[in-house]
């Protein structure tokens, strides 16, 4: 009986440790995104509306990501150029092979792995902010 109780307690402790280490890794990743200059940058003609974060629920949550939702009052190409200039100044490297008139992508390394930046006037993912016509997504 004692052996079975010990095994059960050990199993529960291991499960708790695995859960906590996974949760703390996701928390570190969220902090990494929030500490990046692109998370809080602002520009004239690009009005910040709010953010939408990936959900951590479910047995296998999606990658950690934050989408910043904006309404632009300047031409889309100008908005893309302003944002990508700031990204470059902040250490991001633009992926010029995926460049289009509506979308830009960039990447940067970190201790947690690679971070991706996605800037678009085309694919809008902001359900809470229907007036959104420009997004910046940062994902690990």
Per-segment meaning from a language model:
Residues 2-6, 13-19, 23-140:
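An acidic-aromatic pocket/loop used at catalytic or ligand-binding sites
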